[in-house]
Amino acid sequence: MSDFSITCSDFDEGAEIPKKFGYKFENEEPNISFNRPPSSTTTLALIMDDPDAMGAVGKVWLHWLQYHNLTESSPVEGKTDFDEIGYGGPAPPDGRHTYIFKAYALDTELELKEGYSKQELEDVMKDHILAEAKLTGTFAP
């Protein structure tokens, strides 16, 4: 059993995400930490989405998508539902939403190019996930 976890120095599990991380505010990336990945981990991946958006926009809204091969100096980011590459903070149109940050420890390096989709990431991660963890936070306009 892995002790893999994901934490954020900017807010606690289940707590309110500070406004500066909101898309319509400063849109700063929160300080996410991947803790105690399995020793055979070669890549860490992150998906941040908003399942509460289903009621407002008819789908789970993707806010952040990235992977980091541990042999590389920086992560490679995918395209969000804002049609932008990189972090797109919370921006609920209809009240308080819960945001889920899902972390994955993988046993293979990935070769997706910047701007990849969530489906592309999920497809290449399949059969390579060593451990998973999640962090939730809430945000209201």
Locate the predicted segments by residue:
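N-terminus-centered regions that define maturation/targeting leaders and the start
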Residues: 1-141
